[in-house]
A protein has these predicted regions:
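Exported/periplasmic cell-wall-interacting domains
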Residues: 19, 24-26, 79-86, 105-190
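Solvent-exposed coil/turn segments that connect beta secondary-structure elements
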Residues: 57-59, 66-69, 78-80, 94-97, ...
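Bacterial Sec signal peptide processing site at the extreme N-terminus
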Residues: 17-38
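N-terminal secretory signal peptides that target proteins for export/translocation
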Residues: 1-2
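Bacterial N-terminal signal peptides
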Residues: 7-18
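N-terminal post-signal-peptidase region of extra-cytosolic proteins
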Residues: 34-51, 56-57, 71-90, 102, ...
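A short, compositionally biased
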Residues: 54-60, 134-136
């Protein structure tokens, strides 16, 4: 009887110790990027078609390849009066070195800027000056009304700044341009 009690007690001790073991650690939480980080891009090893989701509230793009998260980027979308429209789009055209046909700056005869945020429909350059159309490098057209994604300044990350386009950090635009194709889906949400 004593042996049975010992065996039962030993079994109970093993059972209790087994249940009291430390549970597995939860998966690590994503580490927020260092301040000033404008994008993260990790497409290596991912296979499949790209897709992009742009959130107008957070001014951030999420990029997927084959349904797997490949990276994110801050963006600058349309400022008040030039609001970027939510909806489902596809990339219609890709041009490495594109310039706006409406917006830019006026300069005098010496090349000094007279008006920095000029509209060619209403802002004429001074005599001897000219209109310099804004560069939109790595242009990825979303509409035939002049809206697309391209490299450009992000003056205040998290805030709107453009005339309706989706600006990407200048360093990131060529990397994204390389991965997308005509027909890549782009969803813009509020």
């Amino acid at each position: 009887l004593w042996g049975w009690r010992f065996a039962a007690g030993g079994f109970l001790a093993v059972l209790v110790l087994g249940c009291a073991s430390t549970p597995p650690a939860p998966p690590p939480q994503p580490v927020p990027p260092p301040p000033g980080t404008l994008y993260e891009w990790n497409p290596d090893g991912l296979i499949g078609e790209p897709s992009i989701i742009i959130d107008l509230r957070t001014q951030r793009a999420e990029i997927y390849i084959g349904g797997e998260h490949a990276g994110w980027s801050v963006v600058a979308t349309g400022k008040e009066g030039f609001n970027t429209q939510a909806g489902d789009y596809t990339i219609l055209e890709k041009v490495v070195d594109k310039r706006s046909t409406l917006y830019g700056r006026t300069v005098d005869a010496y090349g000094s800027t007279v008006k920095a945020d000029a509209d060619a429909r209403r802002d004429s350059p001074p005599e001897g000056g000219r209109f310099v159309f804004a560069p939109m490098p790595y242009w990825m057209r979303l509409t035939w009304r002049g809206i697309g994604m391209h490299g450009g300044p992000i003056p205040r990350p998290g805030r709107t700044a453009s005339h309706g386009c989706i600006r990407l950090p200048r360093e990131f635009a060529p990397q994204l341009f390389e991965y997308v194709r005509i027909g890549t889906p782009v969803r813009i949400i509020r």
